[in-house]
Every structure is written in structure tokens, then in C-alpha cells.
């Protein structure tokens, strides 16, 4: 039987060479599967996260950093800082500033979105609403369209930012985004669960963040089918 060749990142290999192992990103992985199964190996899902706060000691930035530590192995999380995005001006929606162009490009390139939001005046903070307005405009050029999304929130109060989350969900209807519904991550009394260095120290909170990420990954895979 003539050996079959298979083109990989490591070069042109025969099926005999591929049978015991395949090189992926510098790591050698062993498989007891056929060549076609190797060819269909799932790529790592990408998640873009951002927090609706500019504050240096933000609790929501802290839960986002915790998410980066807890993301499942089959996914990666990149955090985008909203610092520097100017107030939305519809006069410039077709020629936005460079930071907005980068933000929209990151959104389009990612598989899923993770938002961490404070609650201001029973609703979404201006920083987050402003970023969403830029990224979804002009009409017909909505970077968020079709994206799976998960929400986290943290506050020093009892409700943990619940009202901001529900207002965000209203926006998702128009933005044509697909939110994860469970579990809900609403970190109440955040000062007791996040230390002075900005690390989430409450194990139950870390567990729920991990579960939310697992749900987001599963939901993203399902939507891709």
C-alpha cells in the first residue's frame, strides 16, 4: 500500500509518520486515531473580554483577570482595555478613531465575548455603553452580530450588579448576540471576595466564574455546528 501524504504545520508527512504522533504548536501529542480524525482536531476557541470600568482598582477588572486564570484549556481569553475610547460621536461613526477600529477588529476576529460590568444608577455604566455604541455602528456594520456572549458583574452591594446585567441583555436583542443564561455570575459584597491586590479570593466565586466559562465554550461550540 502506498503511503498517504498529509500536509501539516510541520511539513509534508506520510500517514506512517503521523500514526504515532502529530506536532501541534511545538507540542507532541499522541493519538490512537486515524488521519482524518487528526485533520479535524478542534482549534482553540478565542474569547475577547472587556470590563465596563476604567478604575484602576475595579472589582470587575478583577473578576475578568480571574476569568483569564480559569479559562478552560480548549479556549483562550484576551482582555481589551476600554481606556482611551472617546465619547461616541455619530459624525465619525464611518471614520472612527484607531482604538475603535482595533476594538471592532478584535470583536470580529473572536469566537465569543465576555463582559464584566459594574452597575451605575441601576444600569449599565457609560464607559461600557459608549464602547458598545462605537462597536455596533454605523447601522449595518455591527461587530457584535451573531456573537455568543457571557456576562459577569461585581459590586459592593447585595445584588452584585444584577440590574446592569438585565439591561445589557436588552441590548443583546438589537445587537443580535446570543447570551449564556446560566450560571449567573453576580459577585455581591465584592470587597469581601476580592483582596487589595485585585485577586478573587472567594472560592465559590471562582467556581462560578469557571462554570460560566465552561458554559460559554460549550454554547459557542453548539452555535458553530
Where are these regions (language model features)?
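A generic structural motif
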Residues: 72-78, 177
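Glycine-rich phosphate/pyrophosphate-binding loop and the adjoining helix
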Residues: 41-48, 178-225
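Short hydrophobic segments within beta-strands
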Residues: 50-51, 80, 152
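Helix-loop-strand module that forms the ligand-binding subsite of alpha/beta enzymes
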Residues: 95-176
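Short, Lys/Arg-enriched N-terminal segments with co-localized hydrophobic residues
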Residues: 28-40
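N-terminal beta-loop-helix "entrance" segment that forms/cooperates
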Residues: 82-98
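N-terminal beta1-alpha1 ligand-phosphate binding loop
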Residues: 42-74
